[in-house]
């Protein structure tokens, strides 16, 4: 739903999204300044506040923040991005993307200790104090590691990692944690799912005991993921 909202918003504003395929096979959004502004409008605005509203209805005292607020997420802006087009590796410059390297844990601890539930979203802040689009899956892995989480759940529009994508009947139920980096398992990730698998690798390296790839389309997706549905890495 949220991806569709962002896509429709970009089309309505006359700036359709463009995706880049990197040499390693990962797919990411090309983020020029206009795209970044649309991203902020949709994710920091509509999506974040909608989630806060839903959580408040369930009795959780949620508070919505972006990585810009209080320098919550800080990282390095990429000066150039490599991508593949028609079999050739090219370089795109002027992108507003980056990787989070610092988390303002003191701010998060302050909120958590006061009884708030933070609802967090990119963008992050660069070291030059510019907004940068960052990978939410990488941020989730970083936070799970930072707080010693028992489990990390990644939700998407498929039931988990599929052996024969897009055949949902080919769901891979479990991956041994020590084998998550094996080529046969890394190869299961298609398109933007590669980012989630990379996040899982990072989380496992950081000591997270269980990572679950699960279906966002079902009722109670988090509860069902934690009960064993989807693809479980442990």
List the model feature ranges, each with a label:
Residues 1-234:
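C-terminal catalytic "cap/lid" subdomain
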